[in-house]
Amino acid sequence: MKIFFAILLILAVCSMAIWTVNGTPFAIKCATNADCSRKCPGNPPCRNGFCACT
């Protein structure tokens, strides 16, 4: 049982690390570039109605 929980913990940490590297795990809708600058770090542009930080 300890091995099972260890594997779950490793998977959770890895998934959080991937989300951190790639930005948010969900799409952020926007109308202008200013919307993205408030919602995402690094002031990404708004492309096709979604922020480029995703």
Swiss-Prot record:
It comes from the Eukaryota. It is found in: Secreted. Expressed by the venom gland. Residues 1-23 form the signal peptide. Keywords: Calcium-activated potassium channel impairing toxin, Disulfide bond, Ion channel impairing toxin, Neurotoxin, Potassium channel impairing toxin, Secreted, Signal, Toxin. GO terms for molecular function: potassium channel regulator activity; toxin activity. Has the structural arrangement of an alpha-helix connected to antiparallel beta-sheets by disulfide bonds (CS-alpha/beta). Selectively and reversibly inhibits small conductance calcium-activated potassium channels (KCNN, SK). This is Potassium channel toxin alpha-KTx 14.4. The lineage of its organism: Eukaryota, Metazoa, Ecdysozoa, Arthropoda, Chelicerata.
